[in-house]
Amino acid sequence: MGNCESRELVAQAKQNKIINTELDKAKKTDENIIKLLLLGAGESGKSTVLKQMKIIHNSGFSQEEISNKRNVVCANTVQAMGALLDGMKQLQFDFSTRVCNAHEKLIRETLNDKAEYGPFSDAMFNALTELWADKGVQCAYDKREFFYLHDSAKYFFDAIARVHTPNYVPTENDILHTRVPTMGVIEVNFTIKGKFFRVFDVGGQRSQRKKWIHCFDDAKAMIYVASLSEYDQVLLEDNTTNRMHESIQLFKQVINNKYFVNTSVILFLNKIDLFEEKIVTKKRSLGIAFESFSGPSQDLNAAVAFVEKKYRSMAENKEKNIYCHHTCATDTQQVQYVLDAVLDTILSTKLKGCGLY
C-alpha cells in the first residue's frame, strides 16, 4: 500500500542531497538569484502552492510525473476512506447496509498491505463507491471536524468512477489535491524579468522543522502558508493540539528568528474556501479556537480579520512588513493572480531597502 508514496519519499531524499550540495556551493551575493523559502505547518497547503508555481511558471508536470501520480491518487483515496472509517468508529456510527462490513475489511487489509499499490480493482471500486454512499459513512463525514481527515477526501471520493476508468490519467487538478508529506527539501526554479527564482519547500511536520533555519538565512523572502480552515482541527502528530494554534506559534518562531531579520514576509492565509464553508454554511464559529473572538460568529470577513491580526501580532518588531493574501491554493487562476502580485512585490524597487535584492 505504501510503496507508491515511499518511492516519492526516496526521490525527495535524493533530491534533497542534490539541493543541499548546490546550496553550499551557491554564491549568496549573486544579485540575479532570488531565493524564496516556502514555510508552513503540515497540511497548510504550501506544497500545493509549490505545485502551482510549477504549473504557472515552470511548464507544469512531465509525463513521468503525471503517470507516477496515478498510484498516489489511488492511495490517497483509500487512505482517506480508512481515516473516515476510523472516525465513524470513534463516533460510534453504524453502516446502513450489511455489505459495507465486507467493504471495510477490504479497505483495512489494503491499508495494512505494504505491497505496490496500483489502480483500483473492481472489488476496491465497489467497496469505495458503496462505502461513500452509505448513510452511516456520510454521517461520519458530516462530523469530520472531530477526527483527522484530509481536506481532499471528498474530492477523491467524488472522482472514484473517473479514476477507475482504464485510461485514467491524472489531471493537474488531481495532482494539486494529492498529498504526500514533504520530507526534506523540494525545489522549483523559474525566471521572471531577468531574475532567477529558487523556491524551496521544506517539511512541515514537527520532525522536519529543525532543518529549516540554518540552510536558508540568505533567503530574500519567505512565504508562510497557513490554513484558515484548521481552527477546529487537531494535529496529525498528536491528535490533541489545535492546528491553528500550532501554526501561529510556528509563525512566531520563524518571523522572530535572528536569521530572518532582513527577510520580507509574505503570509498566505490559505483554504479560504473551506473556511467560508465552516463559518458561514456549517455555522462553526471561530470562537471554538479563540475565546476572545467576539464575532459576529457567521461573518467571514470578521473571522478572517481576526486570524490575520493574530498572525501579525506574533512579530516582535512591530514595524516589520507582513504582506498578507487570502488564498485557495487549489484554484490555479486565483493563485496565479496572487503569485503575480507577490513576485512583482519582491521585484519592486520599493522593497530594495528591505533586503530583497
Curated annotation (Swiss-Prot):
Residues annotated to bind GTP: 43-48, 151, 176, 182, 204, 270-271, 273, 329
Region named G1 motif: 35-48
Residue ranges annotated for the G-alpha domain, each copy included: 32-357
SMART domains in UniProt: G_alpha
Stretches the record annotates as G4 motif: 266-273
Chain segments carrying region G2 motif: 174-182
A Gene Ontology term for the protein's cellular component: cytoplasm
InterPro entries reported in the protein's UniProt record: Gprotein_alpha_su, GproteinA_insert, P-loop_NTPase
SUPFAM superfamilies associated with the record: P-loop containing nucleoside triphosphate hydrolases (SSF52540), Transducin (alpha subunit), insertion domain (SSF47895)
G3 motif: annotated span: 197-206
Superkingdom field: Eukaryota
Single GO MF annotation: G protein-coupled receptor binding
Single Gene Ontology BP annotation: adenylate cyclase-modulating G protein-coupled receptor signaling pathway
Residues with lipid group (S-palmitoyl cysteine): 4
Function: Guanine nucleotide-binding proteins (G proteins) are involved as modulators or transducers in various transmembrane signaling systems.
UniProt-recorded name of the protein: Guanine nucleotide-binding protein alpha-1 subunit
Annotated organism of origin: Caenorhabditis elegans
